[in-house]
């Protein structure tokens, strides 16, 4: 799956230790453990900023998940009926359902960024033309597709969007910790991350980096541990967007995962090597259809395919029950891309997620299993 599992051992150890010895409410007391918890949170913010190449003055906002982060960002913008919102065809419902919710409320227009239907890559020249015809107000795009593994050209799209003063939000859930990124001076205003994916941290923590100077109105309100006599939310970032008790156990796990973060270029190269090996083997199996961007240097370790004569969920069950192999099947919570893949008759795709701990021997078992299933 594109969710990473298992985690580095240090993640489990850090979460267990703090759950037993320091799971207190950060920012809600002056005693030593509360100060230590606050220090851990601030240290983790710094790690995230450094990993993402963000500006020193950028803010890191923690949430319970990337989905909630998308809600905080999109729910914090001031929408108008005249807004023009561009989205990539690769967007997860963590973004798309939120956008659709506000579109129904405000009536703004949503346009898909142009896609080359053959290469399954964004068409930058056509996107620039789209922007000249209908100027973007907001541009939303994933950094990496959780269906095809495609690495989107986020810097190039952001540069074009900024010529029209657009707000640019990137969902980096499948990228941060794997694909190098430098947010500083990129034109990207908000960059979402998920602790449990390519960062190799736990569930229960995600968030976003606010790199630009765009202010968001509070999406959620409540206690922050500061200015408690004031019924309005405190005006300072990131507290204005972080009501409620922080999940210090999950943040401790994320902190440990970030400390254990491997060299991203080396890790990405290893995933590509394994993915290319798997792809070449699958190409030789009759009845296997692959869904990939053409350029292997624009892919991560996600490999999606179908098998003629089977629905995706049927293959998933066979792999699980007969071979003890876990894969994700179906539409992967991505509503727009499948009309380009033309995979509806298969009930979506079968997705293999190659990660940090994948072994060559495991790929051989998978390839053998797919050969046997395809043969019937």
Question: Which residues does each predicted region cover?
Answer:
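Pyridoxal 5′-phosphate
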Residues: 1-376
């Amino acid at each position: 799956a594109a969710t990473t599992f298992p985690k580095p051992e240090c993640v489990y150890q850090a979460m267990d230790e703090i759950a037993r010895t320091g799971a207190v409410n950060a920012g809600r007391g002056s005693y030593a453990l509360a100060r230590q918890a606050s220090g851990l949170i601030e240290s983790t913010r710094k790690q995230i900023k450094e990993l993402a190449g963000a500006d020193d003055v950028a803010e890191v906002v923690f949430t319970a998940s990337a989905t909630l982060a998308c809600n905080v960002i999109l729910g914090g913008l001031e929408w108008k009926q005249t807004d023009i919102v561009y989205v990539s065809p690769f967007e997860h419902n963590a973004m798309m359902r939120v956008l659709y919710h506000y579109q129904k409320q405000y009536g703004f227009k949503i346009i898909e960024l142009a896609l080359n239907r053959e290469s399954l890559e964004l068409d930058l020249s056509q996107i620039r033309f789209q922007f000249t015809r209908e100027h973007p107000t907001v541009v939303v795009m994933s950094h990496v597709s959780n269906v095809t593994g495609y690495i989107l050209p986020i810097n190039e799209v952001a540069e074009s969007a900024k010529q029209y003063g657009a707000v640019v939000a990137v969902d980096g859930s499948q990228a941060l910790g794997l694909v190098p990124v430098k947010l500083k001076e990129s034109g990207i205003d908000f960059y979402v991350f998920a602790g449990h994916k390519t960062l190799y941290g736990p569930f229960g923590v995600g968030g976003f980096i606010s790199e630009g100077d765009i202010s968001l109105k509070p999406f959620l309100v409540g206690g922050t541990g500061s200015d408690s006599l004031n019924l309005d939310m405190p005006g300072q970032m990131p507290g204005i967007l972080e009501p409620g008790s922080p999940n210090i156990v999950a943040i401790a796990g994320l902190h440990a995962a970030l400390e254990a973060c491997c060299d991203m270029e080396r890790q990405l190269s290893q995933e590509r090597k394994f993915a290319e090996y798997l792809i070449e083997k699958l190409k030789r199996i009759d009845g296997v259809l692959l869904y990939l961007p053409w350029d292997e240097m624009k892919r991560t370790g996600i490999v999606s395919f179908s098998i003629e004569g089977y629905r995706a969920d049927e293959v998933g069950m066979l792999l699980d029950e007969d071979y003890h192999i876990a894969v994700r099947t179906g539409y992967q919570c991505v509503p727009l891309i499948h009309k380009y893949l033309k995979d509806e008759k298969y009930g979506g795709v079968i997705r293999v997620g190659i990660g940090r701990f994948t072994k060559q021997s495991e790929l051989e078992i998978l390839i053998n299993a797919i050969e046997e299933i395809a043969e019937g």
